[in-house]
Structure formats: C-alpha cells, structure tokens
C-alpha cells in the first residue's frame, strides 16, 4: 500500500500530492522530489501553474517583520512551470506512484519533478522557548504550488498550497574507526603520572541507542580518584549570518568509582543522550520537525570535501567528555580535587532504513489541515484522515 501526503489550499481549488516528506541526502546526490498537482480547470483559466521548492534559513519570528526586520533568508529556490509545460523542460519518466495518482485523479492532475542541489543543509530546528510562538528558527524546506500569469505576480497565501518537507542524512554504510584520546597528568609530590585513555568502538552511533564509552586508567600517583563523570555536548555553529557557537550539554552522569593510588582501572560505561531529557533547553538543535513531537536531537552534519560551510547555515556536531575527579588529599580533602579529562568526537545519526517497496496498488492519502482563510500559517499537524480518498 502506497502512502500519499495531500495538502489543499484554503479555496479548495489546488492540491499537492507527495509520496513522502523525507528526502535523503546521500552526500553526492539527493533523492528527487516527484509529485502530482491537482487543479480546478475553472480556477486555472488559462493561467500558468508553478511548483516551487524553497530552502530557507529562519533566524527570527514572523511577528518581527512588522518593524521592518526580515529574519528569513532563502538559501535556494527552484521553480518548475507545470502548466503549460515548457518545451525546454527535460522529459523525466513518471514514477510508479505518479502513474497511479494520475490514473486516480484524472485529467486535471499534472506531474512535477524537482531536484535539490547537493550543497544544501539538512533540515534543522532550534528548540523554541516555552513562550515562543510561530515557526521555530532553523533550516526548513517547502514545496509550494500556485497559479499566476507569471512569477512576478503576487500570490496570496490562501491561493497557494505549501507542504513542508525534510532533507535528511543517514549514517554512512561504511563508517570509519572509533575515536580514541589520551592524556597524561603529573602531580606535585608524585613521581609517576596519571594516565587516562578513553575510546569508542564505533565512529557512528544511532539516536536513542546506548553509546559505549571505554575508560582505562593507570593511576601511578599517590592520589585517589573518587568519581568518573561522562557528558555529551551538542555544538551548534550558526555560520550564515554570524559566527555564533552554542554548546549545550545533552547528557551528564557521575559514576562513583574509587580508584586507589598506584592502581589500574578499566571499564565500559553506557550513555544515551535523549531529547526527552532536554525538552526544556531553548536553542537546542533538533532534526527538522513535520509534526509536534516527531523529532529527536539533531543529527551530526556530514560535510562533503570542499563544501562551503556558509551555505549550510547551521552545523551540528557532538563530543563526549570523560573527566576524573582526583582527590588531592590533605586536610581540605575533596575541596582541592583536580579535574583530569579527555574529549572524543561523536557522530550521532539515524541508520539507513531498508528499502521496502509498496506491494499493493492501493493508495492511502493522508490529508493535512488547510490554511485558514485569514492567511494565518497553516498547521503542520496531520489530520486523522487516512483513507482511500477519491476512489
């Protein structure tokens, strides 16, 4: 059974159909966006019909535009004239889903094909604060269709249909070796040093899955190690309009492990950073959202060699920190404890899913709320309207 997403403009004259809303960036190419637009012929009235793909970086709220400030920058715009089709447009073969939709919807349905360029960022949302309203800041993608005499004509929101999509990346099939780090610390009155090693067995880890952090300690000093603290930091670089860098701790835990002087220690610890434990942190980078609550911590940004970082708008990376709390002893005890630590880079992503082709010619259409006539931004929540519509 093929699932199809449908969105209709508020006047009911124009609908857009897409077979999916997540499009995978394979680093060297991005999956094409193929869909169908259904239009009322009386509404078209000899005008042209366009489909537009927009990638935008939003770093402020729409309500601030009234004071003359624009907090949105279009990073990429691609337009296809669907009706009448331009003679110079390349003839792209129809997909199986497009053929089924055209057969189902009739003569007033038209196919379209859009292709993202490879140097665009992935969808990222910055978690809003509790009092924030409107669209969240971040990188978003939108497919829009409208009828007009030409592209310069101003089209109201109620006369166009817009559907938010996501550009995503999956973990590489053949990841590299796991990271490793070491530090050596010498203390006053100790003839031998303290050596800390930390490593992970894998380069890439998956959202929601435990991350194994291996710790090895050679304590040749006369100091006692009281605790091991492991934390995971998310680093968000906003590189488009400024050089802002935000570091937020998404996981932290202290493990009580007493390591005596002149002894060794080795153990593997499991840590799992989750959005559920960080839902109150404003500005935390998340994977782009389609519905309320359907996202997770942002995936690590995978850069192609030679790529211009500025075009990406927002870069997301992670690091694991391992710190030892070393007691210096004496009458002050832990008040004079010293911190010894190392950092490991962490790549956090989703695994590549298996490709399961639809085994049936049936089409299930999931329809989304229309934009309100007042021009207000439409809801991105799906209606519970899954059914074999239009058959």
UniProtKB/Swiss-Prot annotation:
Subunit relationships: Homodimer; disulfide-linked in response to retinal illumination. Interacts with CXCR4; the interaction is dependent on the C-terminal phosphorylation of CXCR4 and modulates the calcium ion mobilization activity of CXCR4. Interacts with GPR84.
Family from the record: Belongs to the arrestin family.
UniProt-annotated stretches for the region Disordered: 369-391
Gene Ontology cellular component annotations, sorted alphabetically: photoreceptor inner segment; photoreceptor outer segment; synapse
Gene Ontology BP annotations: endocytosis; signal transduction; visual perception
Protein name: Arrestin-C
UniProt feature, compositional bias: Basic and acidic residues: 369-379
Keyword Disulfide bond: yes
Key words, A-Z: Cell projection, Disulfide bond, Sensory transduction, Vision
Organism: Sus scrofa
Principal location: other
Origin: domain of life: Eukaryota
Phylogenetic classification of the source organism: Eukaryota, Metazoa, Chordata, Craniata, Vertebrata
Molecular function GO labels: opsin binding; phosphoprotein binding
Entry's localization field: Photoreceptor inner segment; Cell projection, Cilium, Photoreceptor outer segment
Xref: SMART domains: Arrestin_C (SM01017)
PROSITE patterns in the record: ARRESTINS (PS00295)
General function of this protein: May play a role in an as yet undefined retina-specific signal transduction. Could bind to photoactivated-phosphorylated red/green opsins.
PANTHER family for the chain: ARRESTIN, ARRESTIN-C
